[in-house]
Amino acid sequence: MKKFIFDVDGTLTPSRKQMDVGFSAEFLIFCCKYDTYLVTGSDRAKTVEQVGLDIYNRCKRVFNCSGSDIYDGHNSVYRSNWKPSDELISFLNDELDYSNFPIRTGNHIEHRPGGINFSILGRGEGNMNCLLYTSPSPRD
């Protein structure tokens, strides 16, 4: 049987958004015909929110948190127990303090199985601010 591996954000769904309803129905049929795997940086809850529980459970295996939290349907088959050191968290907080970027939306250090997600901007409200943060600033 053919096997297919898909990224979620920006491939099956718009980044951090839910899958289109029409596409979702077609993709579920696809998952019934082929061994389908998902790979994402998001945790299980966010992935289910994006693709829906039917698709999530129909996939042969889902590699959440970049492979640090792996599921076969409802069954967890692997979860990394790595935790960041206090020194690393302190360093990231220092980087946040030293940044000149003026906008902060909260949730700057997000703990996930096997890793952390760090953002100067933060993971709080306001996706539009991402464009401001990633746009190159004019040089003097």
Predicted regions and their residues:
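Short, charged/polar, Gly/Pro-enriched secondary-structure boundary elements
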Residues: 124-128
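Conserved small/polar residues in nucleotide/adenosyl-binding loops
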Residues: 133-140
